């Protein structure tokens, strides 16, 4: 089932590299507009939010649409790793607010080591 939005976390990725990838994968990006600590743009018709250093060295990328080229976070994370060559983390499936805290700490890491399930405490 297609997720209503896509969110991945990228380690040490530059905003410009992400912009270039989004332009290629989704569509031309409008100029980034900074609002507080976040940056927003449109990639094609998709609203995008970039939060630098959302969790330590990890940047958050949110595509706020179900009309992305990817079915879910994992598919997007795989494409991002292939294009950018930096470690990517994402939730293993759609995340629900009412999930147990232990489940909320389960993540998928995609890197040069391959794909693995990890425990990542983000608080």
Residue ranges of predicted features:
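Short secondary-structure junctions
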Residues: 23-38, 116-118
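Short, extreme N-terminal segment that most often corresponds to the first beta-strand
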Residues: 1-23
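A general secondary-structure signal for short beta-strands and their flanking turns/coil
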Residues: 3-5, 56-58, 81
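Short, intrinsically disordered low-complexity segments
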Residues: 30-70
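Short amphipathic alpha-helices in soluble, non-transmembrane regions
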Residues: 18-27, 75-79
